[in-house]
Design a protein with these regions (language model features):
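Short, basic-rich loop-to-helix N-cap that marks the start of a DNA-contacting helix
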Residues: 48-61
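Short, charged recognition helix plus adjacent turn
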Residues: 72-102
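Short alpha-helical "recognition helix" segments of helix-turn-helix
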Residues: 29-31, 59
Length: 102
């Protein structure tokens, strides 16, 4: 029996649930403090926008952490969404390279 997978978690959900809400920081304040339009943060939090390198650098500096953390969240999310969309097609469409004997 195939295990049911949990849906991928958008980085915006992590931003909101693990950073903004516990720290009492509004989306508007974050946007102003990192010098981006408030709409950008709102769209990220609602899963309608990706975290770009620019945004990752700003979030990293604001939260005193690696910008790579934010990019890794985004990359992992995109990989999981794509994997879910492709489902079993990869098995049919991609042939694994076979090692050649010497």
């Amino acid at each position: 029996m195939k295990q049911k997978k949990l849906p991928p978690i958008h980085p915006g959900e992590i931003l909101k649930e693990e950073f903004l809400d516990p720290m009492g920081i509004s989306q508007y304040r974050l946007a102003k403090d990192i010098s981006v339009p408030p709409r950008r943060i709102n769209e990220i939090v609602h899963g309608k926008r990706s975290i770009t390198a620019d945004t990752a650098l700003r979030l990293g500096r604001f939260f005193a952490m690696s910008p790579q953390f934010w990019l890794n969240l985004q990359t992992r999310y995109e990989l999981e969404v794509t994997e879910d969309n492709l489902e079993n097609r990869l098995d049919d469409e991609v042939h694994v390279l076979q090692a050649q004997s010497a």
